[in-house]
């Protein structure tokens, strides 16, 4: 009723009034974006006087509330952070700890001094998140940055969003994450075209690096790219690192609590990314001049000369990286706090200045509990190490890593071995089936342990016996405990034993993919003391969580990587922990676990020496000792424990309660206890080691040579540019490549038989590298595999196919920005496309067209594995062969591009006589049509790097959070090819015959030539471009703003602009006093009243929400029609109903032919509720579209009548004309093919 009344009132307006109304609304929106709220209010009131409606009234109310809120407050006060020159909002500044202010000053010094990047490597739990948010607050307030890209693991998104809201409520923060491609794209466009922070994940970066690095088809330069948990790019050849380097950025900041986890090459990789190659030279030089001497010096059997050289080289390395690197440990911060006179002064005199005092951290005792193997474990361990047939029984490969994996399982629990191995080793009456071997870890787990009694499960493992007694004692004492393990099957056993003992437990592992559920369990554990145990996998639970309610941590099995275990411990030992923390690391005596621990100690000494934690830490073990992993030692006593006890026995920090607890631990039949936290408390005397070679100039010369080589490589501009162009950072620096493709000679190709899998073309190198990567289920893995070992063959077989199947142990795959082999899959986009391609290959007139525009279409498959023959040329199809058919995307009526919203897959079965009929009918009249059909649907690649990989999941594949994307994978990759349309300029505007048999989103997905593999997933990316720069006449519809005001300097509601044209209250505090004389109020986006900024954002974006209301839609559409009649000048935009596809091929080709190659078309994201704003006047009347629809229906009806009368040729003409208007009706398409078939027979 209200809608009809509003429509009637709008109908009463004259064309002049309608035009004035729309003009006022448009100008009011522009004023709002520019921050002039008074002018916006005035203009909205004028619009209301002409035509009052709910939409305008709502906007007026919002602006009035914002003005009132602003008027109530005076100026914000700002403070210079540590005299660095960066002004920070006072209230925010006063809530920061002193060391956090120093961190912000360090970040600003990088910007101020022209350094392009740096690493903030504070210990875990010291608030790196808060430091970054406060730094960005000051930078945005001073208008020094506009666009920031923040990349992090998926599990941390909610934490960052919560902290942004808490500290800087006025900052515009959006996420590029989630299943909705439209929403992701819209958020990215808002940040790129206005300003603010966009948050995304490493997986999203890998899948969408092109979209994140471009806007409207051009390179988009971010002011800052910030990586949290930056050790994800510790290897420069991982997918995360490669894609991150492809994002153009003026400045890069890395956040990590563990800058080195294994070796110094990881440190080089981080600095090479952060400083964009301008600090540590090339990897080869760094390895030779720095890594090798330092690593050798850390070994116990190093000569005095090697030790002295390593010491001096590490000192030199620290001096080089010092301006770019800041790391503080908890102990260092605590010591500084206790000796800081300013803090003590402020405590006595509160008026001196507000300094937020850091709370005291509790004591941490990190204990190593040396566990003896039970007789059963000891027996199996000895047999495995000594007997060949036992190795063959338990081993799937001869890889030494696999042997270590089996030995680690034996140390934890024999039931971790396969069901067959347990049965053959007489470990109870375990069932075994082939299915167990196929499905891996979890499938047989239930049957595997359900038949075993609790007592048996405990007695088979020394660790399990100790753990049950320990957890019972801790529960009785009222402590909450975290239990970490690398294996879900260990957690399954522990969970069952604890539940049977009536423990209240919670659990998080890789199978908990929903962030909401994770947050719920964490919150429950933090607030409810009844939950005494929290079970977590080290990979998932060890990153980004705060679990300070617990005061005890158990590491059930040690990791090869010392940082992994350290991160797990820091879930508890961080700011906010009020109780003393005790950590229990369970390690078995005389086994591979003890040697893994010794390896951890060796790595840790490297980290401490090179990052400055220790000048010269004590050398505990030699490299030779670390190599002896497979020797059998004393299972009753630990040599490592005895060695450490002799060094550190008297240094343990303890109290009466801890002493009593340690006495209890000794009563649990353990071999001994060591103190991990006392490691490296001893330093060697530097003088002692340097005396031997005090007079030698060799060391000094080596240090000078190393520094000279690194500096010369870093400062060599030509070398730097060459590295960038050869690598991924120069992907935007490369010149556009325009290659004239030659026609392929026509050859007689054999008809291929349908195969169950893709052929693989590998060199001997690749085969050996792939074989080397096959290891047993539960081996320790990095989160991302090094791609450098996997080379994809660039050789293309003569039949035109580009098959490549790589089997990897990995959870995901995507398109990389660097060329790693070129795989083109030729998919037909429609039935007519198939027929036309087939006859073209037979007649030879479409060879060039086929070669120029293969459809590089990528589709996700469901998680169940399949190998599919993806790329057969259509001339090779046999009779009744089933074709893998992709649903062609509907044409966007505004962009004239074919888009692909989701992968709708169907299977079409075509008899050969159908194709023959179509071929015969089209042979004479539609050669040009065939070419035109091919071109708009094909998507030329802009990046020559597409490939398909088959992936084999690891046993703990669920622990990688990227697995949660697999249920939405077809929605995650987004970049539509934009170059294809431009090639249609020279094509005759003829009719296109296209067939779409699947418009439904819920169409069942089917795949042909399927062969099931164990836990394999095929993940492909969406369409991408082949060449670096093709033609940008058609811009990417996902990269444009939902607003048309590109020429207007846009107001950022979150951050004031340094521009005299803006209202004074939005000025940065750094504006000169002469400008600020008329300022009513200055505000920071960190102030609480900056919530008004959010209101302004809502006003700006209101058309996207309110325009969904029927009244606003109908009334303003009516007003726009009236405005068109008035003849007022307006920008020309074609507006058609997106739900209809009335675009004829004539219109399409003419539109394309008139577009200029360099022109950037105005486009909108496909998900925007109202692509064109109210203020835009449109030209194309909807009557034409309605008329076209009517013509379409008439043509279809007439064609059916002619068909019934037997007039085949006339009926075919009508239906082809109908398909010119609307090409997506499957009924008409099939009818047309049927007529072609009949015509051919006659």
UniProtKB/Swiss-Prot annotation:
Residues 1103-1181 are annotated as: Disordered. It is an enzyme of class 3 (hydrolase). A motif (DEAH box) lies at residues 228-231. It comes from the Eukaryota. GO terms for biological process: cell division; DNA repair. It catalyses: ATP + H2O = ADP + phosphate + H(+). ATP binds at residues 122-129. Residues 466-626 form the Helicase C-terminal domain. It is found in: Chromosome, Centromere; Chromosome, Centromere, Kinetochore; Chromosome. Residues 1105-1121, 1130-1140 have a biased composition (Basic and acidic residues). The keyword Transcription regulation does not apply. The keyword Ribosomal protein does not apply. TPR repeats lie at residues 21-54, 1192-1225. PROSITE patterns: HELICASE_ATP_BIND_1 (PS51192), HELICASE_CTER (PS51194). The modification Phosphoserine is found at residues 14, 755, 773, 963, 989, 998, 1021, 1061, 1090, 1110, 1173, 1180. Residues 1141-1156 have a biased composition (Polar residues). InterPro entries: Helicase_ATP-bd (IPR014001), Helicase_C-like (IPR001650), P-loop_NTPase (IPR027417), SNF2-like_sf (IPR038718), SNF2/RAD54-like_C (IPR049730), SNF2_N (IPR000330), SNF2_RAD54_helicase_repair (IPR050496). One of its GO terms (molecular function) is ATP binding. One of its GO terms (cellular component) is kinetochore. Phosphorylation by PLK1 prevents the association with chromosome arms and restricts its localization to the kinetochore-centromere region. The modification Phosphothreonine is found at residues 815, 1055. Keywords: ATP-binding, Cell cycle, Cell division, Centromere, Chromosome, DNA-binding, Helicase, Hydrolase, Kinetochore, Mitosis, Nucleotide-binding, Phosphoprotein, Repeat, TPR repeat. Belongs to the SNF2/RAD54 helicase family. Interacts with PLK1, which phosphorylates it. Both proteins are mutually dependent on each other for correct subcellular localization. Interacts (via N-terminal TPR repeat) with BEND3 (via BEN domains 1 and 3); the interaction is direct. This is DNA excision repair protein ERCC-6-like.
């Amino acid at each position: 009723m209200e809608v009809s009344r509003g429509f009637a009132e709008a109908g009463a307006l004259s064309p002049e009034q309608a035009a004035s109304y729309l003009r006022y609304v448009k100008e009011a929106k522009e004023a709002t974006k520019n921050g002039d709220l008074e002018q916006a209010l005035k203009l909205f009131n004028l619009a209301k006087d002409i035509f009052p409606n709910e939409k305008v009234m709502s906007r007026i109310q919002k602006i009035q509330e914002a003005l009132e809120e602003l008027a109530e407050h005076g100026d914000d006060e700002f403070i210079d952070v540590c005299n660095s020159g960066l002004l920070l909002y006072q209230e925010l500044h006063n809530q920061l700890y002193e060391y956090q202010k120093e961190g912000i000053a360090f970040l600003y010094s990088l910007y101020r001094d022209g350094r392009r990047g740096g690493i903030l490597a504070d210990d875990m739990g010291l608030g790196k998140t808060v430091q970054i948010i406060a730094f960005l607050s000051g930078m945005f307030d001073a208008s020094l940055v506009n666009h920031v890209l923040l990349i992090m693991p998926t599990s941390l998104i909610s934490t960052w969003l919560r902290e942004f809201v808490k500290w800087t409520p006025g900052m515009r923060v959006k996420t590029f994450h989630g299943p909705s491609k439209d929403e992701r794209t819209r958020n990215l466009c808002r940040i790129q075209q206005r300003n603010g922070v966009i948050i995304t994940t490493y997986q999203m970066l890998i899948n969408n690096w092109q979209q994140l690095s471009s806007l409207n088809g051009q390179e988009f330069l971010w002011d800052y790219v910030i990586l949290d948990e930056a050790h994800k790019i510790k290897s420069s050849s991982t997918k995360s690192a490669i894609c991150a380097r492809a994002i153009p950025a003026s400045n890069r900041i890395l956040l990590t609590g563990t800058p080195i986890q294994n070796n110094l090459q990881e440190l080089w990789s981080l600095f090479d990314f952060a400083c964009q190659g301008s600090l540590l030279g090339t990897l080869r030089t760094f390895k030779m001049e720095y890594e090798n001497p330092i690593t050798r010096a850390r070994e116990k059997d190093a000569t005095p000369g090697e030790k002295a050289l390593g010491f001096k080289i590490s000192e030199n390395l620290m001096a080089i990286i010092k301006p770019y690197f800041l790391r503080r440990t908890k102990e260092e911060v605590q010591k500084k706090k206790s000796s800081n006179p300013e803090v003590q002064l402020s405590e006595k005199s509160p008026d001196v200045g507000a300094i937020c005092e850091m709370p005291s951290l509790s004591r941490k005792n990190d204990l190593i509990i040396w566990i003896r193997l039970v007789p059963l474990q000891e027996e199996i361990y000895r047999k495995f190490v000594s007997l060949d047939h036992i190795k063959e029984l338990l081993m799937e490969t001869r890889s030494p890593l696999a042997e270590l994996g089996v030995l680690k399982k034996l140390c934890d629990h024999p039931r971790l071995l396969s069901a067959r191995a347990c049965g053959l080793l007489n470990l109870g009456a375990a069932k075994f089936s082939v299915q167990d071997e196929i499905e891996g870890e979890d499938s047989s787990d239930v049957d595997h342990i359900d038949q075993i009694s609790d007592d048996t499960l405990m007695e088979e493992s020394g660790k399990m016996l100790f753990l049950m007694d320990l957890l019972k004692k801790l529960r009785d004492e009222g402590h909450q405990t975290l239990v970490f393990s690398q294996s879900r099957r260990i957690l399954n056993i522990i969970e069952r034993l604890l539940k049977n003992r009536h423990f209240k437990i919670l659990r998080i592992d890789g199978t908990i993919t929903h962030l909401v559920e994770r947050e719920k369990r964490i919150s429950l554990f933090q607030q409810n003391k009844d939950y005494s145990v929290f079970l977590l996998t080290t990979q998932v639970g060890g990153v980004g969580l705060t679990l300070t309610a617990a005061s005890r941590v158990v590491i059930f099995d040690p990791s090869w990587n010392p940082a992994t275990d350290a991160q797990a411990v820091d879930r508890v030992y961080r700011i906010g922990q009020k109780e003393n923390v005790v950590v229990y690391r369970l390690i078995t005596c005389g086994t591979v676990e003890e040697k893994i621990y010794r390896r951890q100690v060796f790595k840790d000494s490297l980290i401490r020496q090179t990052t400055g934690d220790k000048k010269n830490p004590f050398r505990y073990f030699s490299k030779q000792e670390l190599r002896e992993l497979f020797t059998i030692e004393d299972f009753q006593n630990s040599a490592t424990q005895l060695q450490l006890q002799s060094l550190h026995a008297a240094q343990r920090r303890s109290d009466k309660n801890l002493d009593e607890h340690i006495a209890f631990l000794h009563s649990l039949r353990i071999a001994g206890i060591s103190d991990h936290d006392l490691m490296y408390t001893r330093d060697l005397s530097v003088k002692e080691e340097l005396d031997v070679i005090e007079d030698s100039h060799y060391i000094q010369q080596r240090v000078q040579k190393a520094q000279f080589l690194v500096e010369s490589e870093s400062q060599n501009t030509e070398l730097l540019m060459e590295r960038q162009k050869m690598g991924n950072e120069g992907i935007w620096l490369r010149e556009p490549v325009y290659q004239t493709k030659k026609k392929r000679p026509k050859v007689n190709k054999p008809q291929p038989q349908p195969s169950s899998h893709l052929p693989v073309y590998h060199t001997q190198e690749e085969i050996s590298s792939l074989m080397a990567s096959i290891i047993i289920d539960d081996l320790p893995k990095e989160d991302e595999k090094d791609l450098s070992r996997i080379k994809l063959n660039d050789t293309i077989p003569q039949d035109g196919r580009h098959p490549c199947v790589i089997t990897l142990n990995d959870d995901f795959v995507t398109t990389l920005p660097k060329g790693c082999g070129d795989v083109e899959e030729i998919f037909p986009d429609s039935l007519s496309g198939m027929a036309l391609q087939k006859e073209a290959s037979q007649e030879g007139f479409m060879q060039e067209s086929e070669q120029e525009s293969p459809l590089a279409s990528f589709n996700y498959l469901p998680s169940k594995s399949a190998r599919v023959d993806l790329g057969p040329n259509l001339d090779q199809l046999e009779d009744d062969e089933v074709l893998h058919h992709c649903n062609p995307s509907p044409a966007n009526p505004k962009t004239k591009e074919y888009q692909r919203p989701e992968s709708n897959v169907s299977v079409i079965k075509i008899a050969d006589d159908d194709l023959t009929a179509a071929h015969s009918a089209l042979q004479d009249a539609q050669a040009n049509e065939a070419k035109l059909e091919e071109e708009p649907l094909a998507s030329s690649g802009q990046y020559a790097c597409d490939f398909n990989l088959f992936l084999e999941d690891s046993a703990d594949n669920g622990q990688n959070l990227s697995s949660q994307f697999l249920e939405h994978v077809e929605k995650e990759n987004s970049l539509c090819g934009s170059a294809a349309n431009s090639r249609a300029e020279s094509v005759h505007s003829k009719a296109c015959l296209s067939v779409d048999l699947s418009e439904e989103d819920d169409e069942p997905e089917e795949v042909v030539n399927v062969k099931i593999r164990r836990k394999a997933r095929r993940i492909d990316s969406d369409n991408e471009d082949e060449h670096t720069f093709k033609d940008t006449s058609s811009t990417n519809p996902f990269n444009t703003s939902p607003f048309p005001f590109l020429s207007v300097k846009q107001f950022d509601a979150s951050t004031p602009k340094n521009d005299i044209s803006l209202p004074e209250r939005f000025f940065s505090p750094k504006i000169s006093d002469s400008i600020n004389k008329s300022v009513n109020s200055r505000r920071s986006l960190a102030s609480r009243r900056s919530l008004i900024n959010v209101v302004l954002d809502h006003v700006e974006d209101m058309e996207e929400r309110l325009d969904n209301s029927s009244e606003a839609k109908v009334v303003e559409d009516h007003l726009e029609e009236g405005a068109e009649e008035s003849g007022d000048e307006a920008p020309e935009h074609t507006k058609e109903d997106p739900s209809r596809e009335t675009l004829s091929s004539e219109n399409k080709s003419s539109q394309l032919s008139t577009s200029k190659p360099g022109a950037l078309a105005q486009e909108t994201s496909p998900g925007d509720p109202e692509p064109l704003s109210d203020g835009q006047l449109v030209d194309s009347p909807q009557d034409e579209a309605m008329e076209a629809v009517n013509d379409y229906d008439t043509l279809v009806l007439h064609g059916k009548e002619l068909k019934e009368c037997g007039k085949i040729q006339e009926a075919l003409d009508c239906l082809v004309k109908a398909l010119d208007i609307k090409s997506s009706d499957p009924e008409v398409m099939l009818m047309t093919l049927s007529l072609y078939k009949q015509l051919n027979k006659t």
